[in-house]
């Protein structure tokens, strides 16, 4: 196995990502597939790449990711969060740059629960005055 490996856990909505960084040529593997195979939409791929592009480490690391739960954008956000944490484990000096971009903070927004008597979380049944 790799001599030097850095790890970060990322979460977003119901998705959890485990990100492993090893020094290499810039390969990104998500659940055994390449990034382009795993994420069909270009926007999701851009979200994943944001931290390494910001810190100019695109060709420096091989990234191996295991991600579970949620949808594609939730998973992309979880990978970005985990990748940010792994980069900070590699070099703590990157923290201010990543913090300024807003990648360090976990996005705590979750789906609001459906309430009894309502159609959705906040949508009410139609009101009839008479």
UniProtKB/Swiss-Prot annotation:
Protein name, UniProt field: Small ribosomal subunit protein uS9
NCBIfam families: PRK00132.1
GO molecular function, one term: structural constituent of ribosome
UniProt KW keywords: Ribonucleoprotein, Ribosomal protein
GO CC annotation, single: cytosolic small ribosomal subunit
Pfam families in the record: Ribosomal_S9 (PF00380)
Gene: rpsI
Statement: the UniProt record of this protein carries the keyword Zinc: no
One BP annotation, GO: translation
Key word Repeat present: no
Organism: Saccharophagus degradans (strain 2-40 / ATCC 43961 / DSM 17024)
Family: Belongs to the universal ribosomal protein uS9 family.
